[in-house]
């Protein structure tokens, strides 16, 4: 008999007492924090429509975001900041943020199911689930909490750092973002350890040293 984790589609036999689903959003972007969430669903209060957050419309994610927070036994949203990403690298920063999410739960889970192929070091048993956000309801719920939280933050950064299109691409290396990065230089929320940001930073620093053009205030902060 196949393990329920290996079955295709969301498997609601995995909505068990004290099983936490954990997911992240924001490993690939050039700016902003990596955001994680951990969720323990309540078997007595099912949530219809759970799925990988990337497969849902923004409006549907927003509705489920509220419903998950209302119906889950517990949930916690955590993060690793840009400075931690640059210091640790994105993989280790993601593992740290996942650990913070699990440790932040008000109820200690019996098991943590982690989206992906590796687990952070936790004080509770854990197991990775490849494509877990499409297969395990609690991981799907975690993916929704993490994505909505991060997307809202990116929308706020659009107002603070206009001209980069952050509210649209959410920090991912789209042509619009890369062009703005080359033209305007990195902001304090850009990840200096990522090659496109580092290249833009070095190019703007070189121009500043050469005295060719004035730079916008605050764009070359470390």
From Swiss-Prot:
This is Ribonuclease HII. Its EC number is 3.1.26.4. A divalent metal cation binds at residues 23-24, 115. InterPro entries: RNase_HII, RNase_HII/HIII, RNase_HII/HIII_dom, RNaseH-like_sf, RNaseH_sf. The keyword Nucleotide-binding does not apply. SUPFAM superfamilies: Ribonuclease H-like. It comes from the Bacteria. NCBIfam families: PRK00015.1-3 (NF000595), PRK00015.1-4 (NF000596). Residues 17-206 form the RNase H type-2 domain. It comes from Pseudomonas savastanoi pv. phaseolicola (strain 1448A / Race 6) (Pseudomonas syringae pv. phaseolicola (strain 1448A / Race 6)). The gene is rnhB. GO terms for molecular function: manganese ion binding; RNA binding; RNA-DNA hybrid ribonuclease activity. GO terms for cellular component: cytoplasm; ribonuclease H2 complex. It catalyses: Endonucleolytic cleavage to 5'-phosphomonoester. Keywords: Cytoplasm, Endonuclease, Hydrolase, Manganese, Metal-binding, Nuclease. Manganese or magnesium. Binds 1 divalent metal ion per monomer in the absence of substrate. May bind a second metal ion after substrate binding. PROSITE patterns: RNASE_H_2. It holds the Pfam family RNase_HII. Endonuclease that specifically degrades the RNA of RNA-DNA hybrids. It is an enzyme of class 3 (hydrolase). Its main location: cytoplasm. It is found in: Cytoplasm.
